[in-house]
Amino acid sequence: MMPFGKISQQLCGVKKLPWSCDSRYFWGWLNAVFNKVDYDRIRDVGPDRAASEWLLRCGAMVRYHGQERWQKDYNHLPTGPLDKYKIQAIDATDSCIMSIGFDHMEGLEHVEKIRLCKCHYIEDDCLLRLSQLENLQKTILEMEIISCGNITDKGIIALRHLRNLKYLLLSDLPGVREKENLVQAFKTALPSLELKLQLK
């Protein structure tokens, strides 16, 4: 068996990267592989199953409609009829989900809550994509975005398109600087929204 150092050294050689960068690039490459959308898989098993596989592969958890328990083990995803398990909530705490994977969410029709906490690969593009998905515009009721350092005002303001959003928690987001503008934009677009800001 080849040691990790040799493998990553070979990967760096292929990409012509300096050895000191190999670990960072290796993990970035691996996370991109985990996030890659397989449209054939979505067609074969349905959007909820394919999205569950993506989320769990990246370290997130899902809870299905009508169930109390969070599903966090990829190897114990439930089997059965494709339309039986519908994702109701997503907890992406400490996960490696990134924008290239967000097309997995396109067919989801029952997601009510999303928690993004310490997601180092989440950027404004992710929130923009999320807010453009018509199904999610209708179903998402609650969102929490905590300690995601790459999120700025641009990404947050896009969430005003989630027209049934009732609760939004924003905490420890150093890239969010225009708090007053955000508050005003959400008051105008979503007057019944409970907006909680824990920002500096």
From Swiss-Prot:
One of its GO terms (molecular function) is proton transmembrane transporter activity. LRR repeats lie at residues 62-87, 88-116, 117-141, 142-173. One of its GO terms (cellular component) is mitochondrial inner membrane. Its main location: mitochondrion. It is found in: Mitochondrion; Mitochondrion inner membrane. InterPro entries: LRR_dom_sf. Residues 1-25 form a transit peptide. Mg(2+) binds at G59, T93. SUPFAM superfamilies: RNI-like (SSF52047). Residues 1-61 are annotated as: N-terminal domain. Involved in regulation of mitochondrial membrane ATP synthase. Necessary for H(+) conduction of ATP synthase. Facilitates energy-driven catalysis of ATP synthesis by blocking a proton leak through an alternative proton exit pathway. This is ATP synthase subunit s, mitochondrial. The lineage of its organism: Eukaryota, Metazoa, Chordata, Craniata, Vertebrata.
